[in-house]
Each structure stands twice: as C-alpha cells, then as structure tokens.
Amino acid sequence: MPITPQEALQRTIEHREIFHDEMVELMRQIMRGEVSDMMVAAILTGLRVKKETIGEIAGAATVMREFSRRVDVADRQHMVDIVGTGGDGSHTFNISTCAMFVAAAGGAKVAKHGNRSVSSKSGSADALEALGAVIELQPEQVASALAHTGIGFMYAPVHHPAMKVVAPVRREMGVRTIFNILGPLTNPAGSPNILMGVFHPDLVGIQARVLQELGAERALVVWGRDGMDELSLGAGTLVGELRDGQVREYEVHPEDFGIAMSASRNLKVADAAQSRAMLLQVLDNVPGPALDIVALNAGAALYVAGVADSIADGVLRARAVIADGSARARLDAYVVYTRQLAVQP
C-alpha cells in the first residue's frame, strides 16, 4: 500500500523516515496535484524540522526527473552541470555562469540547469539575459545549442512545469524546503557529472551520497567555510567527491592551487548590471579575485567532467582559455546562437 499524505506527516512528526519508495509515491501524488496545499506545507515543514534523509531526497529527485521535460543528448562524454542550491546570501556576481563559458572553452560540454536569483543579486537566468542570451529555450533547442556551442542552459520553469503545483505553497511558506535542494539534482539533460555548491556544510556529504544513489558518475559537492556555495577564496572549502562509486570528503584551500585568499566581499554586486560587468571583466582577462574564483570553479568543473586530471590542472586550463580569449568567444557564440534559435519557426 502506498503511503498516504497523513501517514507521511505523522512520520515526520515522530522524526521517522519516509522510505525511498514511499517518498516516490508521495511525490507523485504531490506533483499530480492530488495533495492539498495545507497538507503539502505541513509535510514540507515536517521534513525540514526532522531533516531530510538521503533516501527521501533521492526519492523526491527521482520523481522530479520523471515529471521534467527532458533534453535528449546523444553523447554525454565530458558533460557537466555547474549548479548551486543558492540561498547562501552572498550577493556575489554570477560565478557559476561565468565558469560555464570557461569550462566550455576548456573542452567540457556544459549542460547548466538554472533559474532566477536566489542568493546572488543575479541568478544564472538573470545573468544570461543581461548578456543578451535567450533563456526560455525548448528542450530540442537546448540540445541544439549544446551540440553547436558546447553550452546548453535549461531554464527551470520550462523544464519542470509540474512545479507550478507547489509554487504557491513554497511562495507563501517563504522558507527553505526540500525543493531548494532538489533543483540541482534534477538536470533535464541527465548530466552524469556535476559540480554542486550547497548552502550548509551538512549537505556536502548528503548531496554527494544522493547523487551516488541517483547513479551519477562523478560529482564535487562544495561548501565554503565563509558560507559560499562555491569553491571559495575567502576560506577553506569542504568537498564531497563522488568518483568510482565511492564518496570521499576532504577540504581544499585556494593556496593549494596557487591562488591568493580574498574575502567574498570583493565579489559582491548590487544588481544584474554590476554582475554582468564583473563577469565580462573576468572573460576579458582582467586580473583580480573575480578571475581567480572563476578559474578555480571552472577548473573544478573541468576536473569533474574528466577533461582535466586534477583541480589544479583544471585551473591552469581555465586560466589559459580566459587569457587567449576563447572563453569570451564562447560567450559571444552562445548569445548569437540562442538568438538565432529564438527566431526560427
């Protein structure tokens, strides 16, 4: 017998786990709109208070993938997603979006799953729009962009229409729920490799093990000790690495890669225009902490994608494609191509 919403709520109140298969059925009911808003809010609150387990998160992510509009990609070799849970409150420029262009220029295929702003002043979707790209592409258009430019951006509302069912509840609740950590786990292109930033240190090991359960090939899940959901320059970064079916947790520091430490306040922006300006400075090879943090995160993406042998090797490759202009050229090519896609009948 599938678990009922009432039984699920009771479990959370008693701090007992909703098992993986039960969570799958419960999430299907929620995504089909069969559970009342009041009950959805109660269950989400109960899960948050008791703390979601690996099995619960993996079960919920499985259903979100089921209900998504998929991007068909024939060759996933060297494919990577660079994504964060958001919610770290850092208000930095869009580091992961800038790293996307660098990683693509360095030889990775970047299938980035993103949305509008959560923790930064400019989310990945906001940043791409400010750069002139078209973000609301259909799945087949994303596949075409990925094939032609090495970059495919999947705007979450296009690919997860079923999320409209829970959007009003999430908006009214106004607090983090399991859905905040599901987005990065539900890449519509099925990227087998992922660089994921998280907003809490506990999630480093949890999300790495969820990805392991979901069948990912390689992953780096990161949290900076200064609170950033990126590999940080301002402090050490906790890392959960999935490789060869095993999860290993460790800590890295910017000095390990020949990068000077720098406080995150040096990366802060007030709005999308400032974020755009800082991103372009990086791609135009202007030295400073913004370039350093992009090289570090793009280097990690190249490592997890299997292009680089190590993060350090990835950082060198990232700096090279920024310096020779190919990362900036990749941005320009992507903007032009998405505009062409948007006007095609």
UniProtKB/Swiss-Prot annotation:
This is Anthranilate phosphoribosyltransferase. It comes from Xanthomonas axonopodis pv. citri (strain 306). Catalyzes the transfer of the phosphoribosyl group of 5-phosphorylribose-1-pyrophosphate (PRPP) to anthranilate to yield N-(5'-phosphoribosyl)-anthranilate (PRA). Keywords: Amino-acid biosynthesis, Aromatic amino acid biosynthesis, Glycosyltransferase, Magnesium, Metal-binding, Transferase, Tryptophan biosynthesis. Anthranilate 1 binds at G84, N115. Its EC number is 2.4.2.18. Its cofactor is Mg(2+). Mg(2+) 2 binds at D229, E230.
